[in-house]
A protein has these predicted regions:
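HotDog/MaoC-like acyl-thioester-processing domains
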Residues: 2-4, 17, 35, 112-162
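Short amphipathic alpha-helical face segments that pack within enzyme cores
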Residues: 63-71
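Short aromatic-glycine motifs in intrinsically disordered, low-complexity regions
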Residues: 9-19, 91-96
């Protein structure tokens, strides 16, 4: 089994290669051994809100899936990182791309998020074998569950994505 490293960073961008406008994790409240809690405030100016739907804007469901995926990526980078020297600011630095989405097992929408809403994103690691990680996620808006899912992420050689 490969050596795994734990990393703790002050900036969300140090965990993920995503950058605005597609970085959907605004802040991280906590990281434990098998879970992460993060937040996102729905920005009325974001590219995916302006056209979904003019005059009655709601956050697209695909963005909620992506929020949980990014939170899962944070957990992998934080606790299950096979790289001691991890740098998300240079796209060619890391030998592996961590937390690449390979499967959405299920997703269930139970409500809407609108511009200005602050979303709580909770993702828990259910299992992992090697570089394959199974998660479930919950997103809440005003303490109401609006999305839940199960998904799988994996680590791939970085050159696969080039």
């Amino acid at each position: 089994m490969a050596t795994l490293y734990q990393h703790r960073f002050d900036d969300v961008a140090d965990y993920l290669h995503h950058r605005p406008p597609y970085l959907l994790i605004d802040s991280i409240e906590s990281i434990s051994d098998d879970a992460v809690k993060a937040f996102h405030t729905v920005d009325p100016e974001s590219f995916f809100i302006r056209g979904h739907f003019p005059g009655a804007a709601v956050l697209p469901g695909a963005m909620m899936q992506e929020m949980t995926t990014q939170a899962g990526g944070v957990l992998i980078a934080a606790n299950f990182n096979p790289m001691a020297d991890y740098n998300t600011h240079d796209p060619h630095h890391n030998e592996l791309a961590l937390g690449v989405l390979v499967k959405i097992k299920h997703g269930r929408y139970r409500g809407f998020a609108r511009p200005g809403d602050k979303l709580s994103i909770e993702v828990t690691l259910d299992d992992h074998i090697g570089d394959v990680f199974d998660f479930h996620g919950l997103i809440r808006c005003n303490d109401q569950l609006i999305y839940k899912n199960a998904f799988q992420l994996t680590n791939l050689p970085s050159d696969t994505l080039r």
